[in-house]
Swiss-Prot record:
Residues that bind Mg(2+) A: 69, 71, 121
Span list, region Disordered: 348-381
Effect on the protein upon substituting residue 377 to A: CdnD-GFP fusion cleaved by Cap3
Residues at the catalytic site: 69, 71, 121
Name of the gene: cdnD02
Binding positions (ATP acceptor): 51, 109, 196-197, 204-205, 307
UniProt protein name: Cyclic AMP-AMP-GMP synthase
Species per Swiss-Prot/TrEMBL record: Enterobacter hormaechei subsp. hoffmannii (strain UCI 50)
Top-level EC class as recorded in UniProt: transferase
Amino acid sequence: MELQPQFNEFLANIRPTDTQKEDWKSGARTLRERLKNFEPLKEIVVSTFLQGSIRRSTAIRPLGDKRPDVDIVVVTNLDHTRMSPTDAMDLFIPFLEKYYPGKWETQGRSFGITLSYVELDLVITAIPESGAEKSHLEQLYKSESVLTVNSLEEQTDWRLNKSWTPNTGWLSESNSAQVEDAPASEWKAHPLVLPDREKNEWGRTHPLAQIRWTAEKNRLCNGHYINLVRAVKWWRQQNSEDLPKYPKGYPLEHLIGNALDNGTTSMAQGLVQLMDTFLSRWAAIYNQKSKPWLSDHGVAEHDVMARLTAEDFCSFYEGIASAAEIARNALASEEPQESAQLWRQLFGSKFPLPGPQGGDRNGGFTTPSKPAEPQKTGRFA
């Protein structure tokens, strides 16, 4: 069964909490204001914006005392052809020492900042273009479309367009609804560059393109795409002992988007469809004990699976095969309790059981006195 009410409750149980959302917004706003007012960097910083799973609404609730991870991009006007990656990043050390003493560390392509309530990942980038083209891009990066700290789920009308403004109520609804994504010619061919200390080179990155692709895919899937990503991430976390460490994060998200058809009608249907498509699409690759090459939505020459080993991909493929069998049975079941128990084999106790009026089994079924633990059968049981 589709059990959409139970899926809705499950999703509410695994989304970041309202407090966590406010924490990362506060952290992002505070950092933005501090950068804006830090005199040595005033002429360098163009804007800062949220990226990553937080911005794309594909993050799941951290377990235990783990803090949310928040990616913040700093867009600068630095000339990457005249400055080394190390020198570019070193410009920000006085800022970090002033506002985050003892709380920051240098990473390969970013700075990590550990606060009591959130983990910030500060990514320094530069606009590689020059002249009028650079000016147009700076306008985009200074626009509400980029600066918003709301996630895609919170701002469903969002478009990548410097003319977009947040929909704050019924008065602005008609105006925001008329704004569509800007033509690809205005943004797609213009990724940012970011410094890599370890390789001592500048590489291309296009977080806005990833955000825009996610927003469009979610609309085409009736709002189910970002929730399906969350569900698969939760399944992976619940079954981590039976799965390889990778893929996770964005590569996992990309694999889901690659397999999910447009027009998704429900969570249950979407899960079965994307797993079945994943298995059929990569069967030959799996049989060859290899892994796929998947182009990044923002920088076409980047393989999203570059750091994933063939061994891990094949192990993950086997995990999806086992999970798909359970998901098919859960969707096919016509008994609410049985269906829910099967979904719980994948997602654990965060997936609720239907209430007493949720449907009865034939043969004397009685409502359990407490939530049942999943039966341990098969790879993920």
